[in-house]
């Protein structure tokens, strides 16, 4: 397990996360070791918003992980369920559509991600260096408990952190 995987595993254990809900993603798979907690694979990101909401209201910590293109697909689920009903959980978002992107369909959502999160009144934190993943996820959990709404942690490709 490399350092970033270890940092994420440390945060998951420290925050007593019981479930990680995810749509398979090559960027996220480089950060996450599925053996550290119960992993639920989703076919669509919207499923994760509903499941994470249900787990949260039943006092079971969950993290939802998705690509930023998937965030675009489920923004209404956040806006119509989690925000009005004060259901907060951490959402880890892999960032596609950057200058290393080889798939042009990812670029528009790459450009829109931060503004989209802000537009629904949520906070996001960006990971900019290897050593701040644990601290950032811990800060996101504190924010979730304080404001009872989703908090997003934006993860770049590992190449941006080296």
Predicted regions and their residues:
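Thiamine diphosphate
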Residues: 1-162
């Amino acid at each position: 397990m490399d350092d970033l995987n270890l940092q994420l595993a440390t945060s998951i254990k420290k925050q007593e996360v019981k479930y990680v809900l995810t749509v398979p993603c090559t960027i996220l798979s480089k950060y996450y070791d599925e053996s550290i907690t119960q992993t639920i694979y989703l076919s669509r990101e919207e499923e994760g918003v509903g499941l994470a909401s249900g787990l949260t209201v039943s006092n079971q910590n969950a993290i939802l992980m998705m690509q930023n293109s998937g965030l675009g697909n489920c923004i209404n689920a956040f806006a119509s369920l989690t925000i009005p009903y004060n259901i907060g959980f951490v959402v880890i978002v892999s960032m596609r559509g950057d200058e290393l992107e080889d798939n042009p369909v990812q670029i528009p959502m790459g450009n829109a991600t931060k503004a989209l999160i802000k537009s629904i009144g949520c906070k996001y934190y960006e990971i900019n260096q290897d050593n701040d993943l644990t601290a950032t996820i811990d800060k996101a959990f504190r924010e979730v408990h304080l404001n009872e709404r989703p908090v997003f942690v934006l993860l770049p490709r590992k190449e941006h952190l080296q």
